[in-house]
């Protein structure tokens, strides 16, 4: 299949089907409505199942059921809808059920607006539900990467037995770009012998849940989860480093925002200013190793939120140099000229 001009939401939905998604459960909410609309037709054509659930809560619990039976299952929503799913996502993590959760983010808090934003960073990376759990969070910056990350998310979910987020936003969902959808398995996956998919008289029944009434057993389960998360942190964290080798000032941004910041870096470089960019491609695990930049004297987090990524940057650099923030929330996007003005102000005599 060659490259096709596609809308982001449809490209991500098509990528899910290419990766073998057999069950999609969703509920309408802007700006991701094209995804369930697309799935309602194409999922049946591909031999899968589509259900428009009665609520976001119902949808995530349907994912729990399908994933627990060993089927590749997915849901999509946007910020307030993802918030409603948090209990179910905690259950998925606790029961170690693979699932893909696509969040096409919009402005908040509350109902907020339907405009693009990045204000769900904390909810996704630091666990919005109860308990000590983590979910891998993949953050695409263009439609090709969005489609690729959707396909990768299914493999990652199966390999680690965990729910996986793909953190897009309204821009990624609504823009159109050329995309080529080719599914290439990333991991060597094993048969799901743990799944509750029927004994067929050949084995003992499997029980898939997150309930441990004995404190010692629950503690052991939590230790097991943390060991798994440590493996994910070691193997899966990644970022794009753009002109960071000699940079005095490094801007940090992800997703759609990084497209603007890349142009800002190019502007500074044209002036002979040593400015670079780190673009986290995984929000969790956060790409700590990408921040090993001994020349850097200042980091600036540029976000479509009110600074939710700053603390992770400070932890990554162990607060050795200053970290500043510039961003906008509620659906507004920092313009290149605004970023340039703030970086000059923050940098002072550094640049």
Task: Describe these PLM feature segments.
Residues 7-11, 227-249, 262:
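Glycine-/acidic-rich phosphate or pyrophosphate-binding loops and their flanking alpha/beta elements
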Residues 304-351:
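Peripheral docking tails and interdomain loops at the edges
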Residues 1-127, 134, 142, 329, ...:
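Thiamine diphosphate
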Residues 161-241:
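Conformationally flexible catalytic loops at phosphate/diphosphate-handling active centers
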Residues 100-105, 138-140, 165-169, 302-303, ...:
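Short beta-strand segments
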């Amino acid at each position: 299949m060659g490259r096709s001009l596609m809308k982001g939401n449809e490209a991500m939905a098509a990528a899910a089907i290419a990766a073998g998604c057999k069950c999609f459960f969703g509920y309408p909410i802007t700006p991701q409505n094209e995804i369930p609309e697309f799935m309602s037709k194409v999922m049946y054509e591909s031999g899968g199942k589509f259900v428009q659930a009665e609520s976001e809560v119902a949808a995530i619990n349907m994912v729990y059921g399908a994933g627990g039976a060993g089927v590749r299952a997915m849901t999509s929503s946007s910020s307030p809808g993802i918030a409603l799913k948090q209990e179910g996502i905690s259950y998925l993590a606790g029961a170690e059920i693979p699932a893909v959760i696509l969040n096409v983010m919009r402005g908040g808090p509350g109902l907020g607006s339907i405009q693009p934003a990045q204000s769900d960073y904390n909810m996704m990376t630091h666990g919005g539900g109860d308990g000590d759990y983590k979910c891998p969070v993949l953050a695409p910056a263009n439609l090709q990467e969005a489609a690729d990350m959707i396909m990768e998310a299914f493999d990652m979910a199966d390999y680690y037995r965990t729910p996986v987020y793909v953190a897009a936003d309204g821009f990624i969902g609504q823009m159109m770009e050329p995309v080529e959808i080719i599914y290439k398995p990333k991991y060597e996956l094993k048969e799901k012998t743990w799944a509750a998919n029927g004994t067929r008289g050949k084995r003992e029944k499997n029980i898939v849940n997150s309930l441990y009434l004995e404190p010692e057993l629950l503690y052991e389960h939590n230790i097991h989860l943390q060991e798994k998360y440590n493996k994910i942190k070691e193997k899966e964290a990644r970022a794009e480093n753009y002109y960071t080798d000699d940079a005095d000032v490094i801007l940090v941004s992800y997703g759609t925002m990084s497209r603007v910041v890349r142009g800002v870096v190019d502007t500074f470089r044209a002036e002979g200013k040593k400015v670079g960019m780190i673009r986290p491609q995984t929000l969790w695990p956060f790409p700590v190793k990408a921040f090993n930049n001994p020349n850097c004297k200042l980091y600036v987090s540029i976000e479509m939120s009110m600074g939710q990524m700053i603390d992770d940057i400070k932890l990554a650099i162990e607060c050795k140099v200053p970290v500043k923030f510039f961003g906008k929330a509620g659906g507004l996007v920092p313009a290149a000229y605004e970023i340039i003005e703030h970086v000059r102000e923050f940098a002072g005599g550094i640049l």
